[in-house]
Amino acid sequence: XKKPVRVAVTGAAGQIG
């Protein structure tokens, strides 16, 4: 799979913003 790096960053940014 894909590494949960982009997902983590995107999820955090989405929750914060």
Curated annotation (Swiss-Prot):
Any one biological process term the GO annotation gives: tricarboxylic acid cycle
Keyword Translocase: no
This protein's record includes keyword Oxidoreductase: yes
TM ranges: none
Assigned EC number: 1.1.1.37
Catalytic activity from the UniProt record: (S)-malate + NAD(+) = oxaloacetate + NADH + H(+)
Binding site for NAD(+): G11, A12, A13, G14, Q15, I16, G17
Main EC class the enzyme belongs to: oxidoreductase
Record keywords: NAD, Oxidoreductase, Tricarboxylic acid cycle
UniProt GO MF annotations: L-malate dehydrogenase (NAD+) activity
Protein purpose: Catalyzes the reversible oxidation of malate to oxaloacetate.
Family: Belongs to the LDH/MDH superfamily. MDH type 2 family.
Protein's name according to its UniProt entry: Malate dehydrogenase
